[in-house]
Structure formats: structure tokens, C-alpha cells
Amino acid sequence: MKNKNISFMTQAAMIAAIYVVLTYVFAPFSFGEVQVRISEALTILPVFTPAAIPGLFIGCLIGNILGGAILPDIIFGSIATLIGAFFTWKLREKSPYLAPVPPIIANILIVPFVLRYGYGVALPIPFMMCTVGIGEIISCAVLGMVLYFALKNTQRHYLHSKISITDNFIVNIYFKDNFYQSPELI
């Protein structure tokens, strides 16, 4: 049980860190009324692990803070990502093509109101729903599905793998058909 908790927290932390880095690196595209937040492609990850739900939420929270977002954006933008991640996880048994839908809808319904009432953007809310929606479709549906199929193909190779570390810090990796042993580190 303890190893499962550690694994869960490690996965969540790694996902949060990747989300923050992608948001920060692509900051010019990640904020505003017309945005394509590349890190939102990670909202496909709850299909693979429930640890992605808190990971994406914390990553979005930290990414918004580091990106200089205002408090309503930090709170409600992160909640939109949390809602999207949760419902992506709930849809994990359905078609993979449905997985990007929850974060797209959550952001379309929440972010335009943050832009209007938090940032004072004078554009009509339906227009901002369209611009945010287009950005989310690019991030979640297009890039997210690319990530999904890349991970799905990789998962096949590592599904039957085992990793062990010996006393001499030699890493042994047992794949389904192959064996790899790293050189001795110490």
C-alpha cells in the first residue's frame, strides 16, 4: 500500500512539473483571450492514471501563479482543469476520442468569464468561448490525442517490464522479450 501511495504522489508530482514547465516555456501562447496552452495536452493523462487529476490541478495552479495570472484566474482556471481531468478519468473506459471533451468543455464554460470579469476583456463572452474553445481543441484534442497514441504505443512495450536496482546501483530492466543491464555506477 505504501508503494502505491508513493507511486501515485510521484506520478502526480511529475505531471504537475511537466505542466508547469510547458506552461512557462510556452507562456506567450498560454494566456489571454486567444490562447493555445500546450500543457493542456496533458489533460489526456487521466486515461492512463488517476494521479493525473491532482497533478494537472496543481500544475495548472502553479503555472498560473508563475505566469502572473490574477487570483480569479489562478482559482477558476485551475478548477476548470481539475473538472476536465476528473471527467476525462471518468470517461477512460469509453472511446479515447471522448477523453479530450471534458477539459475542452470545462475551459469553454469557465475561462471566458475569468477573462471578462477578472481581466476586464471587453470582447463578447460567446466570442471568447469560441477562441478559448479553438485553443482547447488544438491543445486537448489534437496534441492530446497525439500524446495519447504515443503513450498507448509505448505502454505496449513497457506493460510487461520490470525494473530493479542492485546493491551496486546497476539497473536491470526486463522487457517482454529483452533484457538490459546498465553499467555499474559506483
Feature names for model-found ranges:
Residues 1-47, 51-54:
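Hydrophobic transmembrane alpha-helices
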Residues 18-24, 56-64, 112:
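Membrane-embedded alpha-helical segments in integral membrane proteins
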Residues 28-33, 41, 61-76, 80-86, ...:
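Membrane-embedded alpha-helical hairpins and interfacial helices in multi-pass inner-membrane proteins
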Residues 167-168, 172-180:
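Intrinsic-disorder-associated, low-complexity terminal segments enriched in Asp/Asn/His/Tyr and depleted
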Residues 181-185:
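Short, intrinsically disordered C-terminal tails of secreted or membrane-associated proteins
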